[in-house]
Structures are given as C-alpha cells and as structure tokens.
Curated annotation (Swiss-Prot):
Its EC number is 3.4.19.12. One of its GO terms (cellular component) is endoplasmic reticulum. Coiled coil: none annotated. The gene is USP17L18. This is Ubiquitin carboxyl-terminal hydrolase 17-like protein 18. Residues 382-414, 509-530 are annotated as: Disordered. One of its GO terms (biological process) is regulation of protein stability. Its main location: nucleus. Belongs to the peptidase C19 family. USP17 subfamily.
Length: 530
C-alpha cells in the first residue's frame, strides 16, 4: 500500500574533471565528480556549494517564488465535512489534508490560476480550487466532492490513500505546465506544486582510494520511511541518511581514478520543502499485511540533522495534518485524517463527521502519512489571519457536530452535487486512468540509490515520473457507513495498448520502488570542468 518517494523531473549528477569534457545541456541530470582539492584550490568548498545550489540551468521559470501568496486567505475555523460516496474514505481523507495545507489553500483561494487557465476543462488545479474554496467557506456543513477529483482513479473499491494523494498532486503539477509548449525537465521542477512540496536529495559517494567525490541530485515530493526497525520518525530518518559502505561486489567504479574501489555513500536532503510529506511504510511488500506498531512522531520536527549542510541552525517543521489507516492490511480498513485549522485547533475529519480533537489524541495515532510545514511558513500564515478579517467562529454545536451520511439535508444548496460536465470526466479519464498511470510509474520509476556506473539516459523526454503502485490488492468494503459506489468512472473500454499495460502491471507492482542499497539506473551525464 505504501509507495516510495516521488520524483518529478529528472535527476542531476554533476561530474568535475580536471580536463575539459563535452557536455549535454539538455541532460535530465548532471553529475559532479571531483578529486580531493588542495587547500588553495580555486574551486573552494563555498564554490562547490553554490554550484550544487544551481543544480541545472532552467530554461523557463514556470512559477516564480514571488507568485506564491504572501498573506493568508484561509478562514481561521474548520471547514466542511465530506460525504462518503461509497468506498471513498481514502479520497476524503487525502482531500482534507490538502485542503488544510496553508500555501496550497491560499493560492487556491486567491483564484489566480483560474483567472489565467487556458485549459477550462480537465484541469485539476481548477477542480481543486473549486473544492478547497467550497470546503473552507462552508463550516458546519457536509459537501459532496466533485466526481472529477477521482476521475480515472476511483474504480468502485477502496484504494490507497497515499497513492490517490500523489496522483492528485501530480495532476495539479501537470496543470501548471503550458500544454502547448515543450518544457524541459528542469523547468518542470519550478512549478507551484514543486515549490510547495518539492526539494532535492543529494547522494554523495566518496572514493576511499583517490578521495574523489561524486554528488547526485534528485527531486522529491515526499519521503518514504522504513519503520520496521524504527520506534520514531527521527530514528527512521537517521537510518535513511546513515552512510553506507560500498565494497566487494558492490564496489564503486570511480570516475576519477577509473577503477573499482571501496567507497562510502551518504544520502541527505540538499534542499528543504516548504511542506514535508512523510510516508510511513506500514504495509508488507509481499503479503500486504500492516505493520501495526506505534511509531512516535513529534509535533515539532527539526530536519537540520538530515540536511547536506548541518551547521546552519535548526530547521523546524510543525505538524499540521495526519492521515490514518484503521485496519490490519491493505485489503480492508478505513481512512480518516486529523487537520490543524488556522486558528490552531485540531479536528478529526472522518468523512462527514468533523469533531474537535487534541494534540494528545493526534500524536497517539498509528499514522500512515504525516504532513509538516516549516515553522516560519506556518507562523507567517497564522499572523496574517490574526491581522485580517476572520469568518464567524464555529459554535459548540458546530464543533461537536456528528452529521451522518443518512441524515444529510439534500435540499441544502451546500450539499447539492455540483453540475458535472460529462466531457470533463471523460477527458480526465482519458488523460490519466489509474492502470495507465501505475504502469508509467513502474516503467519510468527513479530511485535515490543513484547507480553511478551507468550514465546513459533511457527515459523519454515527455514522460513524467512520479510514483508506482506496490500493490494490486484493492481494499474491500468493511466500513459500515459506506454505500455502493457512485464514482466508478473506469468503465471505459481500454485501448489495445492499455490492455497490454494492465497485463504487464501485475508482474511489476510487487517490486520495491526504493532500496537504499541498490544502484540507480538510467542516467545521462552533464560533465562540468573544474
């Protein structure tokens, strides 16, 4: 059920050689390999840091950072509950976590995208803008999510919430791209979505023979944590960045001394995301059984120890949403979430039910996905809310509301299902069906293991890599409140190619997407002179 980190765009692996070498400016990544430098080397440590920060040339900045809303437009109080349309708790739990992501919500409420969008139909950003605006501006009510949000994904059965979450994030990311123009990989990583959720890994390999160093950079949108041997999120992060020795059969082929030699490899976060999505790998690759252990996670998380540069002071993130799975395997269960409203109060969002909660209850859950935001970002948004005009606060009757699906007032305008353009659903389904999307993840997956032995590229330039589905198993209906499916939008007849893809998918899903000890494939080198 759990999937590994997403990588949108290519990776960059920078190679520094003492002699001039030809380069490919359109490479999906670049590699830096350098020998140990003398004390007065013209390429100082500071120079190398600046070089790494640039990573790769950007042909077009799709979403300049100044375009992000600087002030909060979110209501301070909690918004609406979401109606379960039949096995859609995974959709509702994911949508609530995105709705209460401050930078994303503020951008949606600014309506900036819809004013300039040229797609009009089939745009996930426009669809999410309508949903987030409606959810936040209708506190005390229950609304029905638009079918277009799950078009091409929902098939009438329980699906993986994290998988749907990243499916939605990817669709929003695609909506940021100009559909009529070719965009290079580096520019794709400048979109609004990548600015909010994205950062870069750095994998550094040091040859123990000549002391040459190779740095590889790879974009991420979420971070998957192995919790089998970890009792806390901090321990899982420590294991992730723990140095690894490469020797024997796994010895490193050094590009500096041109021989196989023992080496050390370290994976760290080179740049930090505004919003951090941590996925706890709770489900077995083979059986799908759940690792139902308690893994501690803090309200405030310092990510500085896991960064490439650890001497720049604390990098504190605060928890604002938790996605929870209740059940014993990926075959069954129920999803719900906890979110922190702008006012600072925590709420449990369980489909139509919205109830006040406490931080003690939030931190005691067997979390599946954790959402953190940089403390400075949260404080900036909170301060702007306190200075601005706030909507009415929820009364006690609203806070304690437990609206059941069978008790919905169908005549309330907020509860009416929006008019759904059939062409919108049809187009969204055609553009990205679940099976086709999963197949692309398997065929074009990238890993943070960085196989430095290969530098040739194999990914087509028009393929967008995000993440794979590990499990074929769908979650059966075990939630008593779930109705029969109303969102089965995948009944369209697949093409011959899609049928072939679906058949191939079964043999691919069981493979782990990331394994720290394995090597990375499909690289193209951008060689830079010292």
């Amino acid at each position: 059920m759990e999937d590994d980190s997403l990588y949108l765009g290519g990776e960059w692996q920078f190679n520094h050689f003492s002699k001039l070498t030809s380069s490919r400016p359109d490479a999906a990544f670049a590699e830096i390999q350098r020998t140990s430098l003398p004390e007065k080397s013209p390429l100082s440590c500071e120079t190398r840091v600046d070089l790494c920060d640039d990573l790769a040339p950007v042909a077009r900045q799709l979403a300049p950072r100044e375009k992000l809303p600087l002030s909060s437009r979110r209501p301070a109080a909690v918004g609406a509950g979401l109606q379960n349309m039949g096995n859609t708790c995974y959709v509702n739990a994911s949508l609530q976590c995105l709705t209460y992501t401050p930078p994303l919500a503020n951008y949606m409420l600014s309506r900036e995208h819809s004013q300039t969008c040229h797609r009009h139909k089939g745009c996930m950003l426009c669809t999410m803008q309508a949903h987030i605006t409606r959810a936040l501006h209708n506190p005390g009510h229950v609304i029905q999510p638009s079918q277009a949000l799950a078009a091409g994904f929902h098939r009438g059965k329980q699906e993986d919430a994290h998988e749907f979450l990243m499916f939605t994030v990817d669709a929003m990311k695609k909506a940021c791209l100009p559909g009529h123009k070719q965009v290079d990989h580096h520019s794709k990583d400048t979109t609004l979505i990548h600015q909010i959720f994205g950062g870069y890994w750095r994998s550094q390999i040091k040859c123990l023979h000549c002391h040459g160093i190779s740095d590889t950079f790879d974009p991420y949108l979420d971070i998957a944590l192995d919790i089998q041997a970890a009792q806390s999120v901090q321990q899982a992060l420590e294991q992730l960045v723990k140095p690894e020795e490469l020797n024997g059969e796994n010895a490193y082929h050094c590009g500096v001394c041109l021989q196989r030699a023992p080496a050390s490899k370290t994976l760290t976060l080179h740049t930090s995301a505004k919003v951090l999505i941590l996925v706890l790998k709770r489900f077995s690759d083979v059986t799908g059984n759940k690792i139902a252990k308690n893994v501690q996670y803090p309200e405030c998380l310092d990510m500085q120890p896991y960064m490439s540069q650890t001497n720049t002071g604390p990098l504190v993130y605060v928890l604002y949403a938790v996605l929870v799975h209740a059940g014993w395997s990926c075959h069954n269960g129920h999803y719900f979430s906890y979110v922190k409203a702008q006012e600072g109060q925590w709420y449990k969002m369980d489909d139509a039910e919205v109830t006040a909660s406490s931080i003690t209850s939030v931190l005691s859950q067997q979390a599946y996905v954790l959402f953190y935001i940089q403390k400075s970002e949260w404080e900036r948004h909170s301060e702007s809310v306190s200075r601005g005009r706030e909507p009415r606060a929820l009364g006690a009757e609203d806070t304690d509301r437990r609206a059941k699906q069978g008790e919905l007032k169908r005549d309330h305008p907020c509860l009416q299902a929006p008019e759904l353009d059939e062409h919108l659903v049809e187009r969204a389904t055609q553009e990205s069906t679940l099976d086709h999307w999963k197949f692309l993840q398997e065929q074009n997956k990238t890993k943070p293991e960085f196989n430095v032995r290969k530098v040739e590229g194999t990914l087509p330039p028009d393929v967008l890599v995000i993440h794979q589905s590990k499990y074929k198993c769908g979650m059966k209906n075990h939630h008593p409140e779930q109705q029969s499916s109303l969102l089965n939008l995948s009944s369209t007849t697949p093409t011959h190619q899609e049928s072939m893809n679906t058949g191939t998918l079964a043999s691919l899903r069981g493979r782990a997407r990331r394994s720290k000890g394995k090597n990375k494939h499909s690289k193209r080198a951008l060689l830079v002179c010292q």
